[in-house]
Amino acid sequence: KFPSVGDEINISRWEYFAHSMAKECGIDAAECKVVSSKDSRDVLLSKRFDRTENGKRIHMASSLTLLGLNDGDGESTGKGYLDIVDFIVANGSVDMEKELEELYRRVAFNICIGNTDDHFRNHAFLLKKDGWHLSPAYDMNPTNKYYHSLLIDGYTNESSLDVLYEAHESYMLDETTARGIIKDVTRNMRYWESMALRCGLSRSDLKNFQERIEDGMEWKCGSTLHR
């Protein structure tokens, strides 16, 4: 993925950070790295996850396709993450519980970093012998926005861990599991600055999203647990 001439921030390294941070938070994220082009620009390389070790194709489909939705469907049309939950329950693998926990963890992470370009095309599934599995997470980037492309629960797209926590039953998770996931994500997110520096960003770069990430990590329902 090549940067655009008009980019005001280092898009490649911020996306690399997002994927690296996601893994730190226990998320199955796509493998990627940053290399320098001949003109010294940072370029993000992402490893394909729809191929086997010997190059055989693994059938992949976006949630947009699998849900029979149209481009643009999302919070404005009353659609969101719970539609993906419904698909996992109806068509998922024998590891349905694991898939639901993974999705919930991804939503928590997206809230923390402000990954609000989380439309249905950015959530995909791989078809394996035992059914559909969430593909590794991909195309994640921090932003300074506070509203997601998809509804977090059945009513709002507000980027809030409290909204996500209150919706845990709709994600088919018990309270203990939901608390544990959010607690784990926020605990690991405390070290986001160190991760960003390791990913080649400067301390000056961190100011671009510092306030948004700190806001995203706020969790009133679990304040006594994760601080």
Which residues are covered by each model-predicted region?
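Anionic ligand-binding catalytic core segments
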Residues: 1-227
